[in-house]
Amino acid sequence: MSKINFLPTLQDAYEPLMAAQIDILREQVVAEGGDKASVQSRFNYAWGLIKSESVDDQRLGVKILTDIYKESYQRRRECLYYLTVGCYKLKEYSMAKRYVDTLHEAEPNNKQVIALKEMVEDKIQTETIKGLAMVTGAIVGIASIAGYYMRRRK
């Protein structure tokens, strides 16, 4: 049986908490000593920040989770999942892939991990195709302009 099968979906990350809810999570962390607060309080706050619509909040959430990952061996798998979601939301797809690949190695049969991995890989593929289309379009545009000027010179 998989160790983590109770995780939120990627779509959950796009349902922001109300400002008052984030304030409560922040106040809990501050009351417990900020960086010295319990792992659970900081984790909850980080997830609340990742769910935020503010990119700065999302980045702070990812940073907090990264710190938790480094210091709490017991929470590493969970952190990897949430870090994947956070990086995906920040459009840092290569980092998201790195995290989800590491998690997938540890839990190759976890359906939530597999689904998240597929979403990350699909997004990377889509972004790659968009990038290639833009480069191709730029080349065609430049070639057209060059051809136009070459014809005018004659």
From Swiss-Prot:
Annotated GO CC locations: mitochondrial outer membrane; peroxisomal membrane
Disulfide topology: none
Sorted UniProt keywords: Membrane, Mitochondrion, Mitochondrion outer membrane, Transmembrane, Transmembrane helix
UniProt entry tagged with the keyword Protein transport: no
Any GO BP: positive regulation of mitochondrial fission
Subcellular location, principal: mitochondrion
Compartment list: Mitochondrion outer membrane
Keyword set includes Secreted: no
Cytoplasmic side: 1-130
InterPro entries xref list: Fis1, Fis1_cytosol, Fis1_TPR_C, Fis1_TPR_N, TPR-like_helical_dom_sf
Ranges that cross the membrane: 131-150
Membrane topology, as annotated: Single-pass membrane protein
Membrane topology, Mitochondrial intermembrane segments: 151-154
CDD domains attached to this UniProt entry: Fis1
Domain of life: Eukaryota
Entry function: Has a role in mitochondrial fission. Has a role in outer membrane fission but not matrix separation.
Domain notes: The C-terminus is required for mitochondrial localization, while the N-terminus is necessary for mitochondrial fission.
Similarity comment: family membership: Belongs to the FIS1 family.
Protein name as annotated: Mitochondrial fission 1 protein
Lineage: Eukaryota, Fungi, Dikarya, Ascomycota, Saccharomycotina
